[in-house]
């Protein structure tokens, strides 16, 4: 049974049915009347010219009118969304190379035109068997391309393009169905492939068979072929404007999605955010916003480089917290507001403001003197004298601690202090303290976060290289190998940072140059010896005090440097590196002065806002680390000697989780009344929004309880030697506590001390106080 003849058996031969073809011609004429009404015929014209043509033989039926096809293909909707933008040529070239669109700055690209329909003729030589398959593949590729273009145009809000792409999609669906049924289609019906469309995967279309012009009228062609038959004078088909001119730069090569699940997730995130920047670039070009378009193009290029470098580094070295977030949809920037005309009187400088405030207090003192109020006069004169010292310090170029200067309620803030000879900057609102944490800004002015990370990694690598060379020169081959391995470990991170991919410095090793030896941080200057060697009174005490202060500053800088390294904050790591380096140089200078008997160097203190790193990122958020350090001089039972001691400690943590206290005990240490335990215990404190308030209430009611026991022997129970309780209220504002607690029997002290330490990830109370005002010693020479 021939399945191809089922339609003919059920409905007859539709392509040669005269009545059906006549009805089709009538419908066609009605549609043509809606699209463009022709001029009315002359009054004297015969009725046949005004009326509808009567049904005739199939040979006289014209089929689908080419004028209807021309009207359907015309894009005269009155929309101006596809007009050429007079944009910067460099910007368009960059966008072309990235998204595959936009024209170059040279000659205008050729506008593709649709080939004129050809009249069907007698069939030529049969095409090859691969021709339908290649044609079908080409149509499917075009269909996929126009579907994507239609979605992109709808998302970008481009109505004319979306409607044009929709018509192309519908036409391609119709052509694909026709080819799948084995029917022949005219190539002029295929929508024009855009210039940036790549069909390398498909086989080239075979050239159409040449058709000979018949000398006589052939029988009526089938319906689909009749749709393209040319009339005596068909109207010209309008040229379709290309949706995207030929690109001038090649698009970046596509990167395959990694097989690693972690990398695949990062790949999808980067790809999605890059596409959002591309959409913003297109919208900015359509709005003629050059700056926004250029910025979006640069961001999209950065994401392309990051995607390309994704296969060169491991997923553990990537910190997605550093990836720029998804951009908001593009909006046209508001026009700049007209600025107020500058006033003739500019803001006063720092020294002038100090002088005005001094005069203010002097006038108040004179007024009190005339009133006979001697106490008020002396007070105001003393306050005015403080401004005398501040003005002298400012004129010498030294920093002035404005926090110690008196002020009145109606006085505004002082302008920032500048060096002599420089113009005082305008008053501005003080910015809020920077956030401490992995998402904090880099803190390096004029540089992006990625540039700061790259410079930091290069410096760290150079430091390890110097350390390896120095160790080799000393003959320490093992240390040199270790430093060399650490130096090589920075290569992948540097490559990722150079490609624009964010990296995490949390796990980077600390170079030996950033760690000062413990022997260097031991006090060496003796006050009596330093004074007796020169005969200057109090010289030794001054040098000893300077040394101790500088040692504390070096320790503070190095501790904060390591903490902020674990937090991934490059800016604050560099800040404390600089402070620590200067403090170590000053420390060596003070020791050299004491050694040679030179004059005590001049120095001063300044108030610095120290970024607080009062948190421990190595701890989980739901635990407290308890460290029982040691006991000192524990009172033993009567009749016991020191060698009889066999001590351990029991601890009880208040009920926080499941309303049950957490208890435990340390190991036994025998033979001493001052045992060193050094045991760390992790106590669970739970999590949740109400956790902190519950902990605060618990720590106010009670704290940690310790009980020191002497281990019992045969037929003897353990004997309690002393107890102590530790209030943990300070954890509300501090992340670490360390204290030595006296042992008691009830309320009576029995002698002996117990040392313990507690750490928590971050304070359970006000954790936003991230800057601490601290006096910082600075040597003047």
From Swiss-Prot:
Stretches assigned to the C2 domain: 605-741
Any one Gene Ontology cellular component term annotated for this protein: nucleus
Superkingdom in the source lineage: Eukaryota
GO BP of this protein: regulation of transcription by RNA polymerase II
Composition bias, Gly residues: 98-107
CDD domains linked to this entry: C2_Freud-1 (cd08690)
Basic and acidic residues bias locations: 285-296, 363-373
UniProt feature, compositional bias: Low complexity: 37-59, 108-118, 244-256
UniProt cross-references to SUPFAM superfamilies, sorted A to Z: C2 domain (Calcium/lipid-binding domain, CaLB) (SSF49562)
InterPro entries per the UniProt record, alphabetical: C2_dom, C2_domain_sf, C2_Freud, CC2D1A/B, CC2D1A/B_DM14
Composition skew (Pro residues), residue ranges: 119-129, 204-222, 324-341
Molecular-function annotations in GO: DNA-binding transcription factor activity, RNA polymerase II-specific; DNA-binding transcription repressor activity, RNA polymerase II-specific; RNA polymerase II cis-regulatory region sequence-specific DNA binding
Composition skew (Basic residues), residue ranges: 269-280
Region of interest (Disordered), ranges: 32-63, 94-134, 187-296, 313-373, 403-447
Record family assignment: Belongs to the CC2D1 family.
Protein name per UniProt: Coiled-coil and C2 domain-containing protein 1-like
Protein species of origin: Caenorhabditis elegans
